[in-house]
């Protein structure tokens, strides 16, 4: 190949690269040019929906008008599949969670891949699982509880919407402590809390926001936090490790993702906007009121987190033989 031809090829590549960079820059400057849709695979009014609306409001003021599209059903898979199939243009986002991106794929599988089907944008917040017992259980500490459970194998029960996060938390706790407790299926956790207070249900594994009213009223007792550190909502409740147990960590978490193939420039911009919002005292306070801790990080860190969580939840689902109800 002659030197002249090599120069022409290099010049052509340089022009192509320059044109590509110009197009990317122009696209970034024009985004968004229309409304952004945030799919929330939960019903309106619950804690996940409330957090999603906090984030949507922040994006509306910092990036562009963002509207909520609630698509609940099938353990979050209906809305999640819709997001995975959307155009990767930055105008359809998903409010992802430990249910949609870790638990549901492990239970059902095949509909979407939590790692390959999405472009992670930002981790938003998390809350640890708490083991709380009702008046039917005499134990005051987790050590007393484990001793009591081992003395009464198969006699204690815990509320477990089949295939739901509280069910997985209970199965993880069983495996970590070697106790024999029995899951009781509930379609609505409201009934489970009623039964716990009445002494008809022995224990519940759930996030602080749902348990706190009962704990503060003295109707339930929190024994342990299933996380690496204590929660600000219950500062006197020890972690698993502090209780001399395996350092088990399981949280309910949520974050923002987009369909796989979404331009990196959009992902980067949205990540910066989310992280800026999570530094806001108002958003921190709003999340704290929901028993949730704000988290920040890069898209790459969130991608690694999703992969790790998907494996953790899948391992528990497989070992416990759980199936989607």
Model regions and ranges:
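N-terminal secretory signal peptides that target proteins for export/translocation
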Residues: 1-8
